[in-house]
Amino acid sequence: MRHYEIVFIVHPDQSEQVPAMIERYKTTITSHGGQIHRIEDWGRRQLAYMIEKLAKAHYVCMNIECDQATLDELEHAFKFNDAVLRHLIVKMKKAETGPSPMMKEVQREEAKKAAAAQPTEAQA
């Protein structure tokens, strides 16, 4: 089986459905004997350019190991899901299990927000 990194962008109005979508894709992969090495929910982020008149979208990254039939089924699911604006599947040489550079940035942003919120809570 081959290793893949999948990034898909979800319509911002459908952000509440992202956990269910991830669960559905996880079920598809594992039911066909594949493995999931990493799933990262990058959250709602600014797009580099407008897609369908949208400036922001919800990003999800998955690192998986599966066969071609499973990959074809996933790609078919992405194409016919109206909530998925774009998807990208890249073949990897090995499994990636550590946090991606994008996830590290997301964690840094969350830490800054938490640090900024603590002094205001201390004053109250």
Curated annotation (Swiss-Prot):
Gene Ontology BP terms: translation
Pfam families membership: Ribosomal_S6
Mitochondrion in keyword set: no
Low complexity bias spans: 114-124
Protein's name in the database: Small ribosomal subunit protein bS6
Alphabetically ordered keywords of this record: Ribonucleoprotein, Ribosomal protein, RNA-binding, rRNA-binding
Family indicated by similarity: Belongs to the bacterial ribosomal protein bS6 family.
Secretion signal, residue range per the UniProt entry: none
GO CC annotation terms, alphabetical: cytosolic small ribosomal subunit
Lineage of source species: Bacteria, Pseudomonadati, Pseudomonadota, Betaproteobacteria, Burkholderiales
Gene Ontology molecular function terms on file: small ribosomal subunit rRNA binding; structural constituent of ribosome
Chain intervals for the UniProt region annotation (Disordered): 97-124
Keyword set includes Ribonucleoprotein: yes
HAMAP family attached to this UniProt entry: Ribosomal_bS6
Protein role: Binds together with bS18 to 16S ribosomal RNA.
